[in-house]
């Protein structure tokens, strides 16, 4: 420990000619530091999340969770010592970020510990100057410029996604950042020949890898920050105009994304694509649709009564999430895990769909969609949660997923038990007409991001569901 601490007090040296191997040699082997140990321990925790059975370390869930807790505790101790040394560098920032991710696994995405650690990561990144023009610093080798741009893009994205999920203001504003990403994905426009055939250009040479995933997520996060600002815009007309501009940017951004990076329905069955590439394609499309989903929140009059466009957006988002859940054995994490996709995209989409069905006058067809297809997606999501495919009882997101599944299942059961009015209206309230839910709707207090545990508990109080008991 003393040797590691002493090494951590030494600066990481580099110049314009420094190679990646020479840089890594400063914190590996005999030069290993506390940051090195911490990143290794973080990798152990991540592995316990992806590898259910590893006989030399754990054979049961109890062993696995014990190892996860131990590795997290040791990682925390190593980080505390690193911070006390006051020797901030690139490696420590990477360690801090990995420690934040570890706590989302151990404490949950809603925990204060995870929220605080993300704030610490942002503070360290700003102290290092990653938000400035790192590429103009002449002494920095190219690989380190790319590393710092990737770190900025990843941290900037996480700040926006966590803010949306928790309903809190973002802490890293684009207004004070020189926004650069590792790969300029949106700079390649598709050109067409005289015959109308798309010309294959440099865009097709861009590899689908972590850099590409990080870059696309950051581009989407940039637009999501603009959307977050609209939620405090008091001028309705100005808000609508800005929302239109943001969506035009999002559409142009999607069209400029290289063709081989765009999702299509056949990609999950394309044997030529790797599990990583399949996950990237779904993630990229989800990020794009999420922008439209958030924008629609700005424009509808009541979240308790979603319009047809909101329903269609939610349906596409839920369909993508369900496809990812069903194809999980053919996917590899390209930047965001499956559970995070379900929580950030799947649950909000499900919540909107439930609200829409409860408020619709026509019980068999709504929003231009097949009711049977919509209900099928909900049933699949509930089934996958209930069989434990997404979360274990000892994992922190289990309560949120389970409560959401219980509410959705209760709704699906109610669909079969309740009588319908002769004109096709669902009997959503004994005394109120469809779309007028009285006290329940006024107490819902939906915000664009309020699809956490409280939302599902409130939804359970809907008059259509409240007379049925939840399973325990």
Predicted regions: what is each one?
Residues 9-19, 65-94, 117-135, 154, ...:
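Long, amphipathic alpha-helical regulatory blocks in the mid-to-C-terminal portion
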Residues 51-67, 103-118, 237-238, 304-309:
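Short coil/turn connectors between adjacent alpha-helices in alpha-solenoid helical repeat scaffolds
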Residues 334-338, 388-391, 411-472:
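Intrinsically disordered, low-complexity transcriptional activation domains
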Residues 197-199, 206, 218:
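Polar, glycine-rich mid-to-C-terminal structural blocks
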Residues 1-78, 209-266, 472:
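Transcriptional activation interfaces
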Residues 48-52, 100-107, 298-301, 357-358:
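Short coil/turn linking the two alpha-helices of tandem helical-hairpin repeats
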Residues 82-104, 337-346, 391-430:
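Long, charge-rich low-complexity segments
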């Amino acid at each position: 420990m003393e040797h590691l601490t002493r090494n951590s007090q030494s600066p990481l040296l580099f110049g314009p000619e420094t190679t990646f191997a020479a840089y890594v040699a400063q914190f590996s082997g005999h030069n290993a530091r506390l940051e090195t140990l911490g990143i290794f321990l973080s990798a152990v925790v991540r592995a316990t999340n992806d590898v259910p059975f590893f006989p030399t370390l754990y054979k049961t869930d109890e062993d696995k969770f014990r190892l996860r807790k131990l590795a997290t505790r040791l990682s925390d101790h190593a980080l505390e010592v690193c911070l006390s040394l006051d020797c901030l560098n690139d490696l420590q920032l990477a360690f801090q970020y990995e420690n934040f991710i570890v706590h989302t696994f151990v404490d949950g995405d809603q925990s204060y510990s995870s929220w605080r650690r993300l704030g610490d990561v942002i503070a360290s990144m700003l102290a290092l100057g990653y938000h400035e023009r790192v590429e103009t610093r002449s002494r920095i080798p190219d690989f380190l410029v790319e590393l710092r741009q990737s770190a900025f893009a990843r941290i900037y994205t996480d700040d926006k996604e966590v803010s949306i999920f928790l309903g809190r203001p973002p802490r890293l504003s684009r207004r004070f950042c020189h926004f650069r990403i590792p790969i300029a994905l949106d700079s390649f426009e598709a050109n067409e020949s005289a015959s109308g055939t798309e010309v294959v250009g440099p865009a097709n040479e861009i590899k689908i890898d972590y850099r590409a995933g990080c870059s696309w997520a950051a581009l989407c996060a940039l637009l999501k920050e603009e959307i977050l600002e609209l939620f405090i815009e008091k001028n309705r007309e100005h808000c609508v105009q800005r929302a239109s501009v943001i969506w035009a940017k999002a559409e142009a951004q999607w069209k400029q994304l290289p063709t081989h990076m765009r999702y299509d329905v056949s990609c999950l069955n394309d044997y030529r694509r790797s599990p990583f590439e399949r996950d990237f394609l779904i993630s990229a499309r989800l990020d794009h649709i999420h922008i439209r989903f958030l924008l629609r929140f700005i424009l509808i009059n009541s979240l308790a009564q979603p319009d047809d466009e909101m329903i269609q957006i939610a349906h596409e988002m839920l369909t993508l999430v369900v496809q990812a859940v069903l194809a999980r054995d053919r996917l590899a994490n390209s930047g965001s895990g499956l559970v995070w996709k379900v929580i950030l995209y799947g649950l909000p989409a499900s919540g909107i769909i439930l609200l829409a069905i409860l408020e619709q006058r026509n019980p068999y067809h709504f929003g231009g969609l097949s009711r049977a297809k919509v209900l099928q997606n909900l049933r699949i999501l509930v089934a996958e949660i209930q069989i434990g495919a997404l979360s274990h009882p000892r994992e922190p997101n289990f309560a949120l997923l389970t409560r959401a599944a219980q509410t959705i299942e209760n709704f699906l059961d109610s669909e079969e038990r309740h009588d319908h009015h002769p004109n096709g209206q669902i009997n959503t309230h004994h005394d109120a007409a469809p779309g007028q839910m009285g006290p329940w709707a006024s107490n819902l207090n939906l915000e664009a991001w309020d699809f956490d545990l409280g939302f599902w508990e409130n939804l359970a109080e809907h008059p259509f569901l409240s007379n049925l008991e939840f399973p325990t």
